[in-house]
Swiss-Prot record:
One of its GO terms (molecular function) is urea channel activity. Mediates the transport of urea driven by a concentration gradient across the cell membranes of erythrocytes and the renal inner medullary collecting duct which is critical to the urinary concentrating mechanism. Facilitates water transport in erythrocytes. This is Urea transporter 1. GO terms for cellular component: basolateral plasma membrane; plasma membrane. InterPro entries: Ammonium/urea_transptr, Urea_transporter. Residues 1-23 are annotated as: Disordered. The gene is SLC14A1. The keyword Cell division does not apply. Homotrimer; each subunit contains a pore through which urea permeates. Identified in a complex with STOM. It catalyses: urea(in) = urea(out). The keyword Chloroplast does not apply. Its main location: membrane. It comes from Capra hircus. The record marks 334 as: Important for channel permeability. It is found in: Cell membrane; Basolateral cell membrane.
């Protein structure tokens, strides 16, 4: 998977220099807006605090899909506006409040600047708006959204104290805890903040295989990615894929593969087609596939196959947890992704090609692979 760098030879007259520079100029320019935009973050350090804060919020919005890129954050915000401006507003409010709370609590500044103190609250705001039985533009909802967003840095800090002992990320566990707590406290019959009624399946679904639509299945692939943010609009899902692609093509590939495997898992269990079309089988497996396929494990053929296995396992676990949690009137959220991926990250093996990235070194898959190759090279050369 490694390519040897090629050298550009210049003649004595220097006629080839401008041409060589032209070839390098475009990749260099792309380097400033792809990946984690590290150069931009460094440039912002001596700029006004308000401008830095906007960068942190945008990175927080994109960190839901493991991306720390403000341009990706803008694209994702556009996708949310395409889906529902009210959900976009609640997501932004949640991210802003959570980031401010983290600053007030003096949390690790590098985590704040990378957006790691905002992404859980992004989901909290969006999903609280989606599960509100009052519909769109129920402005009083902004108060509980702000309150629950304040809990996210607290949950994150507490969970990190435990999970850091095993060098594990907190993922979206704070979001799951905050949303489950809110929906449990309010419920469908709350007079102030009623939530959508979640009930278990009580009858055999009517699945007619001849009615299966290939076009709808194709659309469900981007919709599965869109459902990471609670969006069922294929255009929104396509924009999210574009935002991921801007940061990392490898992440985009695994996001799409994970969504596809979720569709396959749903079909294998004869799930209702409308659930598959709505992307409900794809979002957890998409996140799991990204996490194992190069993000928290260095990408090799072995970890790629492990990512596929994790995506399938996550989809089936999601079906199981949906049935169990519906009994108490709660959605499964991203609990399946968190539990399944943490389980796979705890895997121990003597295979050197299955390499779990140190949390402090995690950036994005392409950079993670470079770190892995350099570490492997140092290990081989060490005894010499």
């Amino acid at each position: 998977m490694d390519d040897n760098p090629t050298a550009v030879k210049l003649d004595q007259g220097g006629n080839q220099a401008p041409q060589g520079q032209g070839r390098r100029r475009l990749p260099k320019a792309l380097g400033y807006i792809t990946g984690d935009m590290k150069e931009f973050a460094n440039w912002l350090k001596d700029k006004p605090q308000a401008l830095q804060f906007v960068d942190w919020v945008l990175r927080g919005i994109s960190q839901v899909v493991f991306v720390s890129n403000p341009i990706s954050g803008i694209l994702i915000l556009v996708g949310l506006l395409v889906q529902n401006p009210w959900c976009a507003l609640n997501g932004c409010v949640g991210t802003v409040v959570s980031t401010l709370t983290a600053l007030l609590l003096n949390q690790d500044r590098s985590a704040i600047t990378a957006g790691l103190q905002g992404y859980n609250a992004t989901l909290v705001g969006i999903l609280m708006a989606i599960y509100s039985d009052k519909g769109n533009y129920f402005w009083w909802l902004l108060f509980p959204v702000s309150a629950m967003s304040m809990t996210c840095p607290i949950f994150s800090s507490a969970l990190n104290s435990v999970l850091s002992k095993w060098d594990l990320p907190v993922f979206t566990l704070p979001f799951n805890m905050a949303l489950s707590m809110y929906l449990s406290a309010t419920g469908h019959y709350n007079p102030f903040f009623p939530s959508t009624l979640v009930t278990p399946v009580t009858s055999v679904p009517n699945v007619t295989w001849p009615d299966l639509s290939a076009l709808q299945l194709l659309k469900s692939l981007p919709v599965g990615v869109g459902q990471i943010y609670g969006c069922d609009n294929p255009w929104a899902g396509g924009i999210f894929l574009g935002a991921i692609l801007l940061s990392s093509p490898l992440m985009c590939l695994h996001a799409a593969i994970g969504s596809l495997l979720g569709i396959i898992a749903g079909l294998s269990l004869s799930a209702p087609f409308e659930n598959i079309y709505a992307g409900l089988w794809g979002f957890n497996s998409s996140l799991a596939c990204i996490a194992i396929g190069g993000m928290f494990m260095a990408l090799t053929w072995q970890t790629h196959l492990l990512a596929l296995a994790c995506a399938l396992f996550t989809a089936y676990l999601g079906a199981s947890m949906s049935h169990v949690m519906a009994v108490v009137g709660l959605p499964s959220c991203t609990w399946p992704f968190c539990l399944a991926t943490l389980l796979f990250l705890l895997l121990t093996t003597k295979n050197p090609n299955i390499y779990k990235m140190p949390i402090s070194k995690v950036t994005y898959p392409e950079e993670n692979r470079i770190f892995y190759l350099q570490s492997t090279k140092r290990t081989v050369q060490g005894p010499l």
